[in-house]
Amino acid sequence: MPDVTVVGGGLAGSEAAWQAARAGCRVELWEMRPVKETPAHHTDLFAELVCSNSLGNRSPETASGLLKEELRRLGSVILRCADANAVPAGGALGVAREDFARAVTETVGSHPNIEVVRREARDIPEGPAVIATGPLTSDALHRKIEELSGETLYFFDAASPILHRDSIDDSVVYRASRYGRGEADYLNCPMDEETYYAFVEELASAELSPIKKFEEDMYFEGCLPVETIARRGPDTLRFGPMKPVGLPDPRTGREPFAVVQLRQDDAEGRLYNIVGFQTRLRWGEQKRVFRMIPGLQRAEFARFGVMHRNTYLPSNRMLEATMKIRNALSERPLFFAGQLTGVEGYVESTAMGYIAGTNAARVARGLEPIRWPEGTMMGALARYITTKEGTLQPINSNWGLVPAPPKRENGRRLGRQERRRRQAEMALGVLERFAGEVLRPPVAAGR
């Protein structure tokens, strides 16, 4: 019998299994694919990225970048594989989608303390367990979780289309990263005013894949379908995912009226995704409307954009900040991780997997689970989703979660950039002390 069972081989489950195994526990990692498929996955690999191939900003002076740096310093297997399979993406950490997932699968699956079991979990396992089945939890397990929680919440999420590189017109697109930061890693499709408004009109009126009427507004605000943004007003897109600022066309020296950006999706550069163009348009409509974009008139689609329902828990009424279920609901040593807990984002899901896996291993060894300090981005996220008043909405890492730095000695506030830099320094300092004093040196050193 394993010391810890982890259900779900996504980002959070893979991280949880790895951390429990690092702590010396025998781990069974259950993944139902390919025995039972989901509406959004295309492979049976662990940590398959079903939406964007970007893990967010690299800089530790951004909230997303700080979270990644915390995980790196703690020895995250997901960040190790992401860094090893990075593709050009300007200031973001973009990864070669399949190479990254394959690396996680091989790394996690080859750990001597981890046994991979390909099966559907129809009930909650006995003993210390981490449920990290994500937003596409199977119906049978979903019912068992609802018996514990009394309810689950949900929203809709969508993925952007992926194009074949050789079908993109190089005489129209140009390479650039916004404000010239880093390498010129993005392909940019420039639009003039007339083309832009014609495109927005067609996009806003295009035929959608059906969902129930009452579900039409149940989207995560940070990942809205591009057609939903278009319906909010004719200029909304060019101040959002199609904003041209910092992207002058080298042929004219001027910024276009609007820009559609394409980001490399694989290591070889054969595939590019349309940045910020998650959609629930019917596939035929995606071809028709997106081929109106300059440079994409003959674009061939490797994958169309798709939409799926994301389930998450009322963690503020159900979980402790350790990711353990509250004793009032169950005295079982049961932990939850990933998007199922109400965080939004690949790295945020990974962070909750790290916490849950570490604490499941502690309980298996007869120790109490531990809370991450709130001065870290990891701890602040865990605290927010487990203490939020009212209805919990999915949340990304953001600076509002961690303590602000003190003002200058003269009482004046710090500038924005200096404030973020100091917040990051404070958080990483707290993390280093926590890792050395509480997690113990073997974990802190990344062994």
Curated annotation (Swiss-Prot):
Source organism, top-level taxon: Bacteria
UniProt keyword annotation of Electron transport present: no
Residues engaged in binding FAD: G8, G9, G10, L11, A12, G13
Any one GO cellular component localisation term in the record: cytosol
Molecular function per GO: flavin adenine dinucleotide binding; tRNA (uracil(54)-C5)-methyltransferase activity, 5,10-methylenetetrahydrofolate-dependent
Entry's Gene Ontology BP terms: tRNA methylation; tRNA wobble uridine modification
Subcellular location as annotated: Cytoplasm
Cofactor requirements of the protein: FAD
Enzyme Commission code(s) on record: 2.1.1.74
Biased composition (Basic and acidic residues): 406-417
Key words of the record: Cytoplasm, FAD, Flavoprotein, Methyltransferase, NAD, NADP, Transferase, tRNA processing
Reactions this protein catalyses: uridine(54) in tRNA + (6R)-5,10-methylene-5,6,7,8-tetrahydrofolate + NADH + H(+) = 5-methyluridine(54) in tRNA + (6S)-5,6,7,8-tetrahydrofolate + NAD(+); uridine(54) in tRNA + (6R)-5,10-methylene-5,6,7,8-tetrahydrofolate + NADPH + H(+) = 5-methyluridine(54) in tRNA + (6S)-5,6,7,8-tetrahydrofolate + NADP(+)
Ranges for region Disordered: 398-421
Major subcellular site: cytoplasm
Signal sequence interval, chain numbering: none
Chain ranges passing through the membrane: none
Family, similarity comment: Belongs to the MnmG family. TrmFO subfamily.
Purpose of the protein: Catalyzes the folate-dependent formation of 5-methyl-uridine at position 54 (M-5-U54) in all tRNAs.
Protein's name in the database: Methylenetetrahydrofolate--tRNA-(uracil-5-)-methyltransferase TrmFO
Organism annotation: Rubrobacter xylanophilus (strain DSM 9941 / JCM 11954 / NBRC 16129 / PRD-1)
